[in-house]
């Protein structure tokens, strides 16, 4: 006997969270809970404003239609990426095919005063990998901050993300302030320039490795080995079903590229599932999941070690 519930939720964000020039005051999304006999599976559907093609309202409409079809015996996945991902996670939990083991190590997202960051990162246990957003300020300032961190902590490796913010000139201004002796400790820089060709040229000219992120979701993208390209950053909420995520990871690994499972600012429930996916598909790579502290609460499932209050399922709005 099948049953299901869909929950709608909204989490207040910390002040200062800006995505593509818009302030994100709340994170809005949906959960689907599928039950069959004694088994249960959960999934999160939370399109990311400014990044997802679909809106939250569109996702809700597609999800509710899919749930009704599933209750009637139809299991075909929807095409909408955020819904396909959430539904496939719920089905995988229901079938016990999403392993429980999780990689809760997250490359910390570095914001704020560089001196404070140096103290925080120096005390980091084990492999020191951190993420810095660049492209929000002047390229020269970004270069100076990155250089300062790499100089102060000799065993630190940085993942940088420019979100296609730079012109070729700004990319060169950034690189000018990063000591060539430190550049090999930039694990990769995600999408430095507005076009892929400009990003490739940046990698060739600076010796700084790049990673594809937004490019993965463009229709003309193909997985090929390229000089200067070291990694792909896979955001499942923006990608689609678990099968599609796994195909992309396998395609990257076949080329010798690092594949990084990364957050689209999901709630704690979604983040714990991403940690499980990372342990399953990319066991040797620290995922990019350090986004929970951008929110003011956890929901349904806790992230280990987080002190944020937990909102129980009973407090969520039911749609069925």
Swiss-Prot record:
Cofactors that this protein relies on: a divalent metal cation
Name of this protein: o-succinylbenzoate synthase
SUPFAM superfamilies, A to Z: Enolase C-terminal domain-like, Enolase N-terminal domain-like
Pathway membership: Quinol/quinone metabolism; 1,4-dihydroxy-2-naphthoate biosynthesis; 1,4-dihydroxy-2-naphthoate from chorismate: step 4/7; Quinol/quinone metabolism; menaquinone biosynthesis
Name of encoding gene: menC
Protein EC: 4.2.1.113
Catalytic site: 133, 235
Broad enzyme group: lyase
NCBIfam families: menC_gam_Gplu, PRK05105.1
Record field: catalytic activity: (1R,6R)-6-hydroxy-2-succinyl-cyclohexa-2,4-diene-1-carboxylate = 2-succinylbenzoate + H2O
The entry's keywords: Lyase, Magnesium, Menaquinone biosynthesis, Metal-binding
PANTHER family noted in UniProt: O-SUCCINYLBENZOATE SYNTHASE (PTHR48073:SF2), O-SUCCINYLBENZOATE SYNTHASE-RELATED (PTHR48073)
